[in-house]
Amino acid sequence: QDGNAVSNTYTLNFSYGLGFVADGTGILMNNELDDFTAKPGAANAFGLVGFEANLPGPNKRPLSSMTPTIVLKDGEPVLVTGSPGGSRIITAVLQVIVNVLDFKMPVNEAVGAPRLHHQWRPEDVFVEPGFDADTLADLGQRGHKITPTRPGTSANSIAVTDDDVIGAADARTRGALAVGH
């Protein structure tokens, strides 16, 4: 109604974060600081390689892929998206954006479409179930090592049209639900 939009991404980092709850709060503590690199050039638990800029300290950045995204057209929101999923977040968000804006898919189809992921190291292209055999064969012929994987992201999204606001819950998350206005 007012043209406002928010995209939010949160994390515990590892499953159950640090593995303890702050006394008297019920809040499970995360371990997002693990995303700083302990040693430049060495891979972290997720296979991401950090450098000097990712060492802990003032004005340094952790190796985080959080990408809460609001896409604007003429200064107005047309798509709000984001996802959990560690290093797979950026490719998941990009694929939803490309599906909606370039392929003109309805937001629910864009969110539900199978996804692939490549993150520099390892040299695998991780593919979710649902890609047709021709696509996978074409990737293989181009030299890509195809590695089947289970879904690892959940890109809940909102499309804003001239007439409506349309929510799309990603079925990769059990119990996901989108409610329109």
Write out the residue ranges for each language-model feature:
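Cofactor-centric catalytic regions
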Residues: 130-181
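Proteins synthesized as precursors that undergo proteolytic processing into mature forms
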Residues: 1-150
